[in-house]
Amino acid sequence: MKRKESYLSSDFRETVALRFPAQAKELNTAFDMRLSALLAENADASKEKQYHLKRQILPGIAAYETLQRVMPKEEALQTVHDYVERLARTSHKQLAALLHIPGLYRLVPGVFVKSTRSVFGPAAGFAPKELQTGNGVWRVDMMKCPYHDTCTEYGCQELCRCFCDSDDISYTGLHPKLIWERSMTLGRGNDRCDFCMKVR
């Protein structure tokens, strides 16, 4: 059975079909070959890290590199940013709608604690340093991140900012009584990502 495509792969195909129809076949082939090579080079990564690599990081790199064949680097970066931003805005809408359920917002910091430990932990290539994880506060410094590390490894560190921005779009202003804070990210050149989600 064919693996379901990442949203980044689908969005890339849509872009080339609409904007570069004459080269669409060639660009899709180039993208597929690059993505296959990236997946092969990272085949020994843990199952936990593969989740992030397959879903976002590697399709993002393949799309970014392939788009540069037909547009300037800055435009390619903005195009991939648009893909990530679109998903983040959808995610924000869904979460905000869910948080209309009375009192549910209080559970959000606790959910962030659990998801950090299960999906964004050392097994996936992250290095979270928990500063506060109780009383309606989730405060974590992320000292290492596979999004940043992989983008840097492939010479496209600037791409990581797309994923950093997606967090801010997804979690800012979810509910009047929830505060999302982050002043630093590895992808924006800082030495850590200082995450905080707390009940007001």
Regions found by a protein language model. Give the residues of each.
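Amphipathic interaction/junction segments at domain boundaries or subunit interfaces
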Residues: 55, 66-155, 159
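Unusually extended, aromatic-enriched hydrophobic runs near protein termini
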Residues: 49, 98-125, 173-198
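Generic structural motif
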Residues: 3, 126-130, 180
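Secondary-structure boundary/capping signal
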Residues: 24, 75, 178-179
